[in-house]
Each structure stands twice: as C-alpha cells, then as structure tokens.
Amino acid sequence: MASPSKGNDLFSPDEEGPAVVAGPGPGPGGAEGAAEERRVKVSSLPFSVEALMSDKKPPKEASPLPAESASAGATLRPLLLSGHGAREAHSPGPLVKPFETASVKSENSEDGAAWMQEPGRYSPPPRHMSPTTCTLRKHKTNRKPRXXFTTSQLLALERKFRQKQYLSIAERAEFSSSLNLTETQVKIWFQNRRAKAKRLQEAELEKLKMAAKPMLPSSFSLPFPISSPLQAASIYGASYPFHRPVLPIPPVGLYATPVGYGMYHLS
C-alpha cells in the first residue's frame, strides 16, 4: 500500500510534465491504469524526461507516419504526371467558372465592339471600296457609228487633199454636198489625213537621216585624198627637178572643230 508521502510526491509541482492522477491502489488493476496513463503521457510528449528515460523507442502510434510519408512520396510522381486530369475528375465545380466567365467576357466584348463600331456616332462611316474598273477607254454612249466611205468618195477626198489641205467653210460645204456627206465628216477626214501625212513625213525624214549617216563621223573626213599631188605639194613645198632632202616630220593627227580643221602632234 502506498504511503501518503509517495502520493504527495506524485502531485508535486516541481516535476516536469503534466500531472498524473494516482491510481486506485497497488493492485493489478491499479498497475494497468498507471501503465496506460504513462503510455498516454509518453505518446503526447515524446520529448519529455519520462520519454527520454524510457526505452527510447518511438511509440506505436507514431510508427505509421514514416510509412505514410513514404507512400505519399511514392504516389507524388504519378500524381504530377497525371496533370490536371485527376483534379478535374475530383473537382468538376471550378470547370464551370472559366466557361461562364469566358461567355460573359465574350458578351461584353461583343457589346463593346458594337459600341465601338456603331456608325454615325462614335466612328466615321465605313468606306465603300469601289470594284476595280477596267482601264480601257470607253466610247461615248451617244457616239455615232463610223461611216464607211465609198471608193469614189475616198478618191475625191484624196484628190481634194492633194490640191488643198485646209478647206474654208464655204469650200467644205460645197465639197460635202457634192459627195453626199456632212460637213463634219469632211472636216474629220481632213484632220485625220493631215495627221497621217505628218507621220509619213517624219518617217521619211528619219529614213533619209539613217541612209545619209556615214560609218565614221563627218569631222574625221579629209577634204582631199592623201595620195593626191596637192597634198604632197602643200606639205613638202613645190616640186622641183632636183628634190631636196626632206626633213623627218613627226606623225600628225587631224582633228576638226566646229570652225574648221586643225593639226596636233601625237605623243
């Protein structure tokens, strides 16, 4: 049977750790209760003096923790590899929110686009792009068809043009009535014939220029042949029965200027 002093020692405040209520007695039931209380104390405070003085083995309740951590570490990689699939399967609620917000945003953007694109109030009216038109010259709608002249009319017009290229008003009226033509037709025919004659004249002049153009420029042409006696007399003087010795003359080149001909020594 425990003495009162020992019971008071159990409740002494100097001891570290929480107070332990004394058991009922020294019987077998009291020993089991003290052991259970001690086990609870050790499990609740693993770093207390009693736990350090005990067998220094981790309590049975704490033993499953490393296994759980190991299992968590083993399953961490598959969870990371699975990605968002598991989270989407377990939490379908947040999936609805993005779609709802996206739909709201799209509606808001459509409203904003309609507000920004409203013509007449906030933006200038859109330009209507005209389709690309053909660049060919279009004839007038009220243009008269081209009148075909007969052979006799053409011959008469050509003879009249050779006689006189410009007709007065009276001459044109008389000539048009003789050919059963209008004054406008005669006037236009003479205008076209004068333009044609001018083109033909320019072509003939160009052809004559090309035919008269020599192979060498005219500035290098000599006024007399080199082998003529006039050229020898002009260079060496008059010819005598007895020829005097001729001094050596350096080679010379002839060149022409707009005024006349000149000579220069070739180096």
Curated annotation (Swiss-Prot):
Gene3D superfamilies: Homeodomain-like. GO terms for cellular component: nucleus. SUPFAM superfamilies: Homeodomain-like. It is found in: Nucleus. Residues 142-201 bind DNA. Residues 1-71 are annotated as: Disordered. GO terms for biological process: embryonic morphogenesis; negative regulation of DNA-templated transcription; osteoblast differentiation; regulation of transcription by RNA polymerase II. Its main location: nucleus. The keyword Ribonucleoprotein does not apply. CDD domains: homeodomain. Acts as a transcriptional regulator in bone development. Represses the ALPL promoter activity and antagonizes the stimulatory effect of DLX5 on ALPL expression during osteoblast differentiation. Probable morphogenetic role. May play a role in limb-pattern formation. In osteoblasts, suppresses transcription driven by the osteocalcin FGF response element (OCFRE). Binds to the homeodomain-response element of the ALPL promoter. Belongs to the Msh homeobox family. This is Homeobox protein MSX-2.
